[in-house]
Amino acid sequence: MEGSKTSNNSTMQVSFVCQRCSQPLKLDTSFKILDRVTIQELTAPLLTTAQAKPGETQEEETNSGEEPFIETPRQDGVSRRFIPPARMMSTESANSFTLIGEASDGGTMENLSRRLKVTGDLFDIMSGQTDVDHPLCEECTDTLLDQLDTQLNVTENECQNYKRCLEILEQMNEDDSEQLQMELKELALEEERLIQELEDVEKNRKIVAENLEKVQAEAERLDQEEAQYQREYSEFKRQQLELDDELKSVENQMRYAQTQLDKLKKTNVFNATFHIWHSGQFGTINNFRLGRLPSVPVEWNEINAAWGQTVLLLHALANKMGLKFQRYRLVPYGNHSYLESLTDKSKELPLYCSGGLRFFWDNKFDHAMVAFLDCVQQFKEEVEKGETRFCLPYRMDVEKGKIEDTGGSGGSYSIKTQFNSEEQWTKALKFMLTNLKWGLAWVSSQFYNK
């Protein structure tokens, strides 16, 4: 509801809208002069058969202004009933709506508000008594009436069909009735028979249902067992594959280990660890040159490393034979190896040197080389105790510290550096390494199987 007010004329214009299309409406002029009787007629409830009481008299119906409920009995047992239409506003008033203008006497705002409230309440009451919301515009009302006419036609057609069926039933004679009674009895017997069959079928259905439940339960149990067996089979298959892989891996490792074992059995540890050879005029051990020449000044670090390998070789051969050297003890210590005097524990004979002027005046290095030559001589004598035919290619004179070339020039070469040339010292060291190589070969041949 919309409203507007003009201060000059003190006029309130109020518009209602259609409850279907929401278009503004103009009320009929009759709404301006609504009295109490007219409002009661518009708001009176619709009369239905459910509202009519059995004890109401014709006089009460007449006084109430409602048309009576008419029932016309007939001899054929069929009652004709006529239900009068509900009393409502005329078509003209139903199609005319919504505007409350100014009061005829120029009433106050209270009068206008009261009229608006009365009109609004009137529409609310009318909407509450039917399935249609009020107010409606003329077009929506026409549409609604068309729909109601269609429903009325459908209802009248149904009524005509019922009447025709009733007339057909009334025209049936007695014979048809007896025949129908017989057919009815036969159908009743057939019904009993079918009911009995249905009961039997129902019993069988219950039995089959119980059996089906048992079979389904058994099938479900078997499915679960099958799934469990499948999982176990898959797990065992996985374990088998893993074990097969492990077995193949172990077999490969065994073959590799056997190959390595066969290779190691054929490998001489001493020959593999200590490779003694020569490089020109130098004797070498593990590619370290032992000695130096004026034309080839070998670094002392390399010479010291060669002496360390030589000490380690003799120490390993002695341990293999169980030989304990007299007078000296070998101490392999890399390029700082030395010999320890057994008669004087505090005396160490270094088998390494840094060169320089001190090298010419310090005779500890020479004493250490002579002591080492003494240990080689003890090793030779120990071997000759068990093998009389054993003989080294170069004879050693420990007291003089020299090595003799018995199979060659017949000369002797000093292992000392003082008062000796580098050529002779280098040749003496080369002969000493050759003797150690022979000793290495003998130990390898004697202790190879062990």
Curated annotation (Swiss-Prot):
Principal place of residence: cytoplasm
Gene Ontology molecular-function annotations: GTPase binding; identical protein binding; molecular adaptor activity; phosphatidylinositol 3-kinase binding; protein kinase binding; protein-macromolecule adaptor activity; ubiquitin protein ligase binding
Chain span(s) of sequence motif BH3: 108-127
Post-translational modification remark: Phosphorylation at Thr-119 by DAPK1 reduces its interaction with BCL2 and BCL2L1 and promotes induction of autophagy. In response to autophagic stimuli, phosphorylated at serine residues by AMPK in an ATG14-dependent manner, and this phosphorylation is critical for maximally efficient autophagy. Polyubiquitinated by NEDD4, both with 'Lys-11'- and 'Lys-63'-linkages. 'Lys-11'-linked polyubiquitination leads to degradation and is enhanced when the stabilizing interaction partner VPS34 is depleted. Deubiquitinated by USP10 and USP13, leading to stabilize the PIK3C3/VPS34-containing complexes. Polyubiquitinated at Lys-402 with 'Lys-48'-linkages. 'Lys-48'-linked polyubiquitination of Lys-402 leads to degradation. Deubiquitinated by ATXN3, leading to stabilization.
Coiled-coil regions listed in the entry: 142-270
Segments of this protein annotated with the region Interaction with BCL2 and BCL2L1 isoform Bcl-X(L): 112-159
Modified residues (N-acetylmethionine): 1
Tissue: Ubiquitous.
Membrane association type: Peripheral membrane protein
Protein keywords: Acetylation, Antiviral defense, Apoptosis, Autophagy, Cell cycle, Cell division, Coiled coil, Cytoplasm, Cytoplasmic vesicle, Endocytosis, Endoplasmic reticulum, Endosome, Golgi apparatus, Host-virus interaction, Isopeptide bond, Membrane, Mitochondrion, Nucleus, Phosphoprotein, Ubl conjugation
Region (Evolutionary conserved domain (ECD)): 245-450
Domain remarks: The coiled coil domain can form antiparallel homodimers and mediates dimerization with the coiled coil domains of ATG14 or UVRAG involved in the formation of PI3K complexes.
Family: Belongs to the beclin family.
Protein name: Beclin-1
Species in which this protein is naturally found: Homo sapiens
